[in-house]
Amino acid sequence: MFFHATLARSFISALSVRGDDDAVDRLNYYYTPLILAVCCLVISAKQYGGTPIECWVNPHSRESMEEYIESYCWIQNTYWIPMYENVPDDHTAREEKQIGYYQWVPFILIAEALMFSLPCIFWRLCSFQSGLNIQTLINAACDAQALLDYSDRQKAVEAITCNFVDNLDLQSPNGRIRARGWIARIKFSRFLSGQCISIVYSFTKLLYSVNVVAQFFILNACLKSSEFVFFGFQVLSDIWAGRPWTETGHFPRVTLCDFEVRYLANLNRYTVQCALLINIINEKVFAFLWCWYMILAIITTCSFIYWIANSFIHSEKVDYVMKFIQIAESSEYKKLQKFEKDATVERLYTVIAFAPHLLDSFVSDFLKSDGILMLRMISNHAGDMIVVQLVRNLWQEYRERNWREFEEHEEMKDVEMRRIQGTRERIVIANPGQTKSFL
């Protein structure tokens, strides 16, 4: 018992909320299993602590016989025949109308909760095996965001930057070293270099979407319904319109049960009428779950498409990084304006050198898809201000590593600025009277 309790606590702690995911992931692996656990608890309380079924027997029968019949009918399944139809004499026809799901509802809900947790377990195992410390980075970023002192925050961001760069370098190993195992070859292949964890996370998103859709098949298979997803809408429509179960047959409350009694070497068959009280709760629970699964399927699918676009479309990645670079550049320019009164509109003193081809190389060759993924994770949990400082430091790191290209760009920029300045001087000389208006 102690081992099972420890195992359960370990499983729950392993699925606790962490920083290496988003809100949609938490709806799937954390909040949905909680909802299913509550539903399972409510149904189990009625099923094992209350009276899930009551059967009408001969008033002259003993109480022990009544308890036996109710236990037998609960275990052996019951069947539903509309009140306006005759009960068929053929026992095979009765078996075809059997209702055999009500005993297994708690176990079905537990299985569904485990299925919602599987993609999360897959993601965390792969994230751990990849070597990227995404969770550590996000926790450090959240701690840095909480710091009020500017110098302490800067030191924390610099430490995060060093760790971030180490993670990026880990995803781009030296190509001259040949990997021996086939797993290492796949992980360090040129195609997957820098985007391995992004592919894994996108695949995890796909697993969440597939799992939600699979729940409709599972529920209908358990309820033996051929109406697929519209069965849930039909149940909701019946509840809303006030149509009784006696007309629809959805989650019937009154069913029939056949049992046999051996008496004096003879086998006597009896039919009793039973009230399935548990189906009152089952109807409300499954109707709610259908609504929740439909909403969750839409949200999860949209989230999957969103992450696919932002992780693998180059223009989206460039625009995302450019936003933070422009914010950092604007912030530095405003700081310079406080001390440099002659700072011109052309931003001659700009700290972050900007060039389109260098930005493309920064995104595709330095950050890559995995770096963009980590930046988005940090932004989701620690806020954009930390990401602005982090991107600024990463840009400076990239600038130091590619100083030759930046020097060439600065030289071209100086030549262009001298040409513009010379043009202005010629304009002033040609129109000396206009200079008075600027004095």
UniProtKB/Swiss-Prot annotation:
Role of this protein: Structural component of the gap junctions that specifically coordinates left-right asymmetry in the developing nervous system. Acts by forming gap junction network linking embryonic neurons and providing electrical coupling between cells, leading to promote or inhibit AWC signaling.
Key words of the record: Cell junction, Cell membrane, Developmental protein, Differentiation, Gap junction, Ion channel, Ion transport, Membrane, Neurogenesis, Transmembrane, Transmembrane helix, Transport
GO biological process per UniProt: cell differentiation; monoatomic ion transmembrane transport; nervous system development
Membrane-spanning ranges: 33-53, 103-123, 199-219, 285-305
Gene Ontology MF term list: gap junction channel activity; gap junction hemi-channel activity
Pfam families according to UniProt: Innexin
PANTHER family associated with the record: INNEXIN, INNEXIN-19
Localization (cell): Cell membrane; Cell junction, Gap junction
Residue ranges of coiled coil: none
GO cellular component: gap junction; plasma membrane
PROSITE patterns listed in its UniProt record: PANNEXIN
Topology versus the membrane: Multi-pass membrane protein
Protein name in the entry: Innexin-19
Family: Belongs to the pannexin family.
Species per Swiss-Prot/TrEMBL record: Caenorhabditis briggsae
Main location: membrane
